């Protein structure tokens, strides 16, 4: 059964995708803009209902993820992707090491990102496949949402700055 998100706004420019963190299943869910006719497919709405101020999003994919734990939780709210980069990022938030790297990220809120596994600071984008991620056994993060490198690459290629993220 498809999951539908109905988004109401007077704004007329909507993004093709919407991201939602499902904390229960530890999944980052990806929704794609759908034709408004799906509203009538899933809900009993009167036939003369004007859906022009609504956007329908259908779930198309979900990605395994981990997110913030008790000591540093992931914020709850509705955000927009503020920026994105395919470049490496050096972080000092990992408790066991002074610095770690990840390769590519989407900025959601301040220092809260969607990014991939963490690597030792001597890894590069070209050599990271030769290294074991230092974060491979983690069950939570310092607040960011962490997905696989493959999924992150897909997000970087397809998600625009401004896309809604529900966390």
PLM region spans:
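Intrinsically disordered, low-complexity
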Residues: 1-76, 167
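Exported/periplasmic cell-wall-interacting domains
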Residues: 72, 85-167
């Amino acid at each position: 059964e498809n999951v539908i998100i109905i988004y109401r706004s007077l704004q007329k420019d909507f993004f093709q995708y919407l991201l939602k963190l499902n904390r229960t299943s530890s999944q980052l869910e990806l929704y794609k803009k759908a034709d408004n006719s799906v509203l009538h497919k899933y809900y009993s709405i009167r036939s003369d209902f004007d859906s022009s101020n609504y956007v329908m999003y259908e779930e198309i994919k979900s990605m395994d993820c981990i997110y913030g734990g008790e000591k540093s939780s992931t914020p709850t709210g509705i955000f927009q992707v503020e920026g994105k980069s395919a470049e490496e990022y050096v972080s000092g938030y990992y408790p066991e090491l002074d610095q770690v790297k990840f390769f590519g990220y989407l900025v959601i809120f301040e220092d809260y990102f969607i990014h991939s596994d963490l690597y030792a600071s001597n890894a590069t984008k070209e050599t990271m496949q030769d290294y074991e991620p230092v974060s491979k056994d983690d069950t939570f993060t310092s607040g960011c949402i962490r997905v696989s490198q493959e999924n992150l690459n897909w997000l970087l290629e397809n998600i625009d700055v401004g896309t809604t993220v529900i966390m």
